[in-house]
Amino acid sequence: MATTLNPSEISDLIKTRIEAVKLSAESRNEGSVTSVSDGIVRIFGLADVMQGEMIELPNNTFALALNLERDSVGAVVLGDYENLREGDVAKTTGRILEVPVGPELLGRVVNALGEPIDGKGPLGATQTAPVERVAPGVIWRKSVDQPVQTGYKSVDAMIPIGRGQRELVIGDRQTGKTALAIDAVINQKGTGIKCVYVAIGQKASTVANIVRKLEENGALAHTVVVAATASESAAMQYISPYAGCTMGEYFMDRGEDALIVYDDLSKQAVAYRQISLLLKRPPGREAYPGDVFYLHSRLLERAARVSEEYVEKFTNGAVTGKTGSLTALPIIETQAGDVSAFVPTNVISITDGQIFLETDLFNAGIRPAVNAGISVSRVGGAAQTKIIKKLSGGIRISLAQYRELAAFAQFASDLDEATRKQLERGQRVTELMKQKQYAPMSIANQALSIYAVNEGYLDEVPVNKLLAFEEGLHAHFANTQGELVSKINTTGGWDNDIEAAFKKGIEEFKTTGSW
């Protein structure tokens, strides 16, 4: 007599049989490419893949797993994808993306994967680190109280930057954003601060020009240049800031100071938007994906000043009593001065202040074109050098009063003496804040210029001769008070003796009339 099975028994039997089948590791860790388009590969059958994992493809090509769906994986190819075909085998690697780190990278130009592209041979780096890392926790951080000198009077006096700060440089195209950041890198020569310059989506010719300028000014030796140019894929432009940050963190973790420039994060957001739309992620405001804020916040939060305990723990006691820092200068390009667009507002809210560069000021010959009214440094004041902090208070006030009165003076024909003096002082302060590119100024020279204008020594100097006067004054002090100049540059201190020397030196120089 035939055995009859009821439906529930059949169901149980099938379940038991399925559970008894042991899938081999190979079948869980191997899949096949189902489609390749626009740098995105869809892979079927990778059951064990992790978010952000490296996937190995034929011809030594790798992809980054970004979308984990029910029965397929969406991954972005790192590099060329012309040789990939439907049906190609894809394998999991069990690793996330890592890049080379260490002092061997200084003086070199690398791509987003840390591969040298400057024709100077292999890097020789022995260590690697993952491009994505959780930012240091609150317990491991220290407050920002050491300065990063940019060499610009307007920035160091009014918008000071500290080690471990994130200071946004924002403005329209062609307003001098990159110039300001490159001069800040050049000014770190001899300070021990290591620099990382990340070029995102820029022309290769522009990057080559920047590298040449760094070399000419002796700054390439302490700098790593990470370049993901406009001709490279969106994936490379998306990961390049994280790769650069990892290279900078190497120095921070070991009790050293580093400065990183992201030029610029607007292009990274565009690259990420492109990848997200190709992966069929739902678009949000301005077609950016929902996590574009997290894209930048997780990057910029990695810039910090870490405590002695953090460094000691990280190095297993090899480095003691030293704090480390990574200072970030992200750059954002605005359209027609619109700082209320999606990405600019995001980055403004993440950073510790912003330097706003204005087209009108730039075209009027005021360079760097810093708008002192809406530029701010939220934490840098505590890090400012003592002498600059003491002297620079009058600068902001003079400029604010000048801007207010200048608008009013357009309609008034006869002005009283006090108003006229304020206007003239404001004109001189504005003129004095001008500075040539690739000519960062030392602390002593900045202090001297600020002191001279604050104390009224420049009131009789014609505005058009002001910069020549300043140049001559600096040369006079270098020749006659060399010891004092080097003392100020070393200590950054301020006392009555220095003030007396400043007064005497300025009066002496004015009597020579050699300007």
From Swiss-Prot:
Protein topology in the membrane: Peripheral membrane protein
PROSITE patterns found in the cross-reference section: ATPASE_ALPHA_BETA
Main location: membrane
An example Gene Ontology molecular-function term: proton-transporting ATP synthase activity, rotational mechanism
Keywords: ATP synthesis, ATP-binding, Cell inner membrane, Cell membrane, CF(1), Hydrogen ion transport, Ion transport, Membrane, Nucleotide-binding, Translocase, Transport
Pfam family, one: ATP-synt_ab_C
GO CC annotations on file: plasma membrane; proton-transporting ATP synthase complex
Compartments, record wording: Cell inner membrane
Biological processes per GO annotation: proton motive force-driven ATP synthesis
EC number(s) given by UniProt: 7.1.2.2
Binding site for ATP: G171, D172, R173, Q174, T175, G176, K177, T178
Function: Produces ATP from ADP in the presence of a proton gradient across the membrane. The alpha chain is a regulatory subunit.
Family: Belongs to the ATPase alpha/beta chains family.
PANTHER family, per database record: ATP SYNTHASE SUBUNIT ALPHA, MITOCHONDRIAL (PTHR48082:SF2)
UniProt-recorded name of the protein: ATP synthase subunit alpha
Underlying gene: atpA
